[in-house]
Amino acid sequence: MGKLYVVPTPVGNLEDMTFRAVKVLKEVDLILAEDTRTSGILLKHFEIKNAMQSHHKFNEPKTVESVVNRIKAGETVALISDAGTPGISDPGFLVVRECVRNGIEVQCLPGATAFVPALVASGLPNEKFCFEGFLPQKKGRQTRLKALAEERRTMVFYESPHRLLKTLTQFAEYFGMERQATVSREISKLHEETVRGSLAELIEHFTATEPRGEIVIVLAGIDD
């Protein structure tokens, strides 16, 4: 029986790719990629020429069985996403779950995940935190925000730039204008930036300055 490797890839800076990740990707029989065009650029940069197959949230339910069967037949497979660690607000959970259910060894390499540097650089308490990823866009959004209103731990969210102001405004409504937070964008890239302050200050800043790039919001928990 083969093995499934879960391989993190850089969230921006290609120099964050690990030696081990390159080695694994060069040795496996098949690479499952969220977007073969995006991953193709990464693989070409590191001279990785192994077979690649599209594996994203729209086809994952249909392709999991065939992937599991290939691993059972002895192939080694690597799972990568466009950026960061697969399964963290990215496709990957289903294939990992099915491999575990079928007794297949799953090995996840340590590596890049956008929320970790954002959390550490925020200056907010990080001994205990909760990762929320992307909030629901419609159904369940208000319910989730109400549930988080009494959360004491630091909270971490992903958001797109065009929805940032809407989300910050909703946070102010549910958590209060003076709640401390940070917005990190373009992590590990040339224009990386972290803006810190109260929700009121962040709303003012991003009303005047259009946000760009992938966003991580770190929000302080409620005071005791």
Where are each of the predicted segments found?
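Glycine-rich, flexible N-terminal cofactor/catalytic loop recognition
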Residues: 1-57
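Loop/turn-to-beta-strand initiation segments
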Residues: 3-4, 73-78, 154
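Short active-site oxyanion
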Residues: 25-31, 103-107, 154-155
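Conserved helicase motor
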Residues: 54-61, 134-136
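Glycine/small-residue-rich loop that forms an oxyanion/phosphate-binding "nest" at active or ligand-binding sites
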Residues: 56, 64-113
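Class I SAM-dependent methyltransferase SAM-binding "motif I" and its flanking Rossmann-like core
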Residues: 94-151
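A contiguous loop/helix-start segment that scaffolds small-molecule binding in enzyme catalytic cores
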Residues: 154, 158-224
